[in-house]
Amino acid sequence: MIFAKGHGTQNDFVLLPDVAARLSLTAAQVAALCDRRRGLGADGILRVTTADAAVAAGVLHRLPDGVSPGDWYMDYRNADGSTAQMCGNGVRVFAHYLRASGLETRDEFVVGSLAGPRPVTVHHADQTHADVTVDMGKANKLGPGEAVVGGRRLSGVAVDVGNPHLACLDPGLTPEQLAALDVGAPVSFDHAQFPEGVNVEVLTAPAAGVVCMRVHERGVGETRSCGTGTVAAAVAALASAGQETGTLTVRIPGGDVTVNITDATSLLRGPSVLVASGEISEEWWRDQRR
């Protein structure tokens, strides 16, 4: 079984090319493969397939709204084996892999997800590096919320970016204090407000067009980056300045991305790196199915 390994601003993924969607992916297998000691190690798995194949194989019960049968489909699984609606960094890496592998030759195409279609523009791609913009769709503010992160109680704004986020901006937080915060520790939030869990971002106030962010992703813990989280952070940061639209650089531990919030949509531009490819032992893979 072949695989590729890549990352978008150090949010890393194992890609499993499975265009016909024939591969069985149990939660136990996903968790084992993502384990950094007994598997390959990753924040998540990206199955590379098409929307119609995913429906035919029962991976999807039906096409997500706006996704066409012939679209590529990113079947994204969190490191704990759960299924996730969307991952902005994952879409960039997914699109890069399609180009680098020769499965796709266009500069502009659509990647389907549980959250709907995500049009991509590949500005540059070679076998290792790519620069990709993802149309993330409209990010919707849902109201205020609170979280406790690293023992610090924070107020935030709930944002729907195809998956749930709570972006917590602390105007008194410096980049140095943010770097020292224990974002990897379990976070507390209102489960009545977020019954399926939530991704929690902690961010500084914007300065000179830059906002610094760290994220605790549901089902994963702290990651070096979160694409949908950077969009949520940009929405919250702009709102703190009394703006509904604008462009910000979001600085995460894994690097910088550019987020453009418009009246109609949100655009995420950033890098992708393909690190390795190889084969997974079929015997090992079978042993992980439980």
UniProtKB/Swiss-Prot annotation:
Catalytic activity: (2S,6S)-2,6-diaminopimelate = meso-2,6-diaminopimelate
Site (Could be important to modulate the pK values of the two catalytic cysteine residues): H165, E217
Any GO molecular function: diaminopimelate epimerase activity
PROSITE patterns documented for this protein: DAP_EPIMERASE
Main location: cytoplasm
Pfam family, one: DAP_epimerase
Amino acids binding substrate: N11, N78, G88, N89, N163, N199, E217, R218, G227, T228
Stored SUPFAM superfamilies: Diaminopimelate epimerase-like (SSF54506)
Cellular compartments annotated: Cytoplasm
Keywords associated with the record: Amino-acid biosynthesis, Cytoplasm, Isomerase, Lysine biosynthesis
Quaternary structure and interacting proteins, as annotated: Homodimer.
Protein name: Diaminopimelate epimerase
Species for this entry: Mycobacterium marinum (strain ATCC BAA-535 / M)
Gene this chain is encoded by: dapF
